[in-house]
From Swiss-Prot:
This is Probable molybdenum cofactor guanylyltransferase. It is an enzyme of class 2 (transferase). One of its GO terms (cellular component) is cytoplasm. Transfers a GMP moiety from GTP to Mo-molybdopterin (Mo-MPT) cofactor (Moco or molybdenum cofactor) to form Mo-molybdopterin guanine dinucleotide (Mo-MGD) cofactor. InterPro entries: MobA-like_NTP_Trfase (IPR025877), Molybde_CF_guanTrfase (IPR013482), Nucleotide-diphossugar_trans (IPR029044). The N-terminal domain determines nucleotide recognition and specific binding, while the C-terminal domain determines the specific binding to the target protein. GO terms for biological process: Mo-molybdopterin cofactor biosynthetic process. It comes from the Bacteria. It is found in: Cytoplasm. The keyword Ribosomal protein does not apply. It catalyses: Mo-molybdopterin + GTP + H(+) = Mo-molybdopterin guanine dinucleotide + diphosphate. Its main location: cytoplasm.
Amino acid sequence: MSKYAGIVLAGGMSSRFGEPKALASWQGSTFIEHILKVMTSTLQEVVVISHSHIKERVEKLVQVPVIEDIPHYKGNGPLAGIVSGMEYIEADWYAIMPCDAPNVSHEWFTILLEQTSNEYDAVVPIINGRKQPLLAAYHNRVKEKIYTLLQEEKRSMGQLLSQCNVKYIAGEDIQANADWFINVNTKEEYVQAQKDLSNE
């Protein structure tokens, strides 16, 4: 069993963006390819949780396993994706990554995983005052908590965190760059993120 593994969540419908965000162009490739390049430089095992509509397209782009949600919980949001990844790869800790934060750096995963310890169920960054539960790490013991929530038709990350012993880490305390956490939900945000990148 690995100590650490990565789970990339690419199962959302991207309704506000107008097309699958995982496949949006970024620095000569796509969001999903760029994110995986960053993650696989730090983590030996990574799995992508994909929506069935784009699974084949994602598989052609990446060299890691691409799976769908566990059938019983299909479409139940990020909790379903996280638990599906946990079932696919056995590890002590899982670094979670959405497919719409293309600025993420391999440094972030190094910092995040250095903060893990057995006394905690989760390590969650707080960036500019906001919790970032989808750019976080979760111990494998939260798997049972997620199943319980899904069985009760509870789907929010906040409901999971309320049941966990969470280590919250402030971005400024760990030298995390706030730009790593910018997520792209609309075409306007996408254009701005590309402008910011070209101005660096």
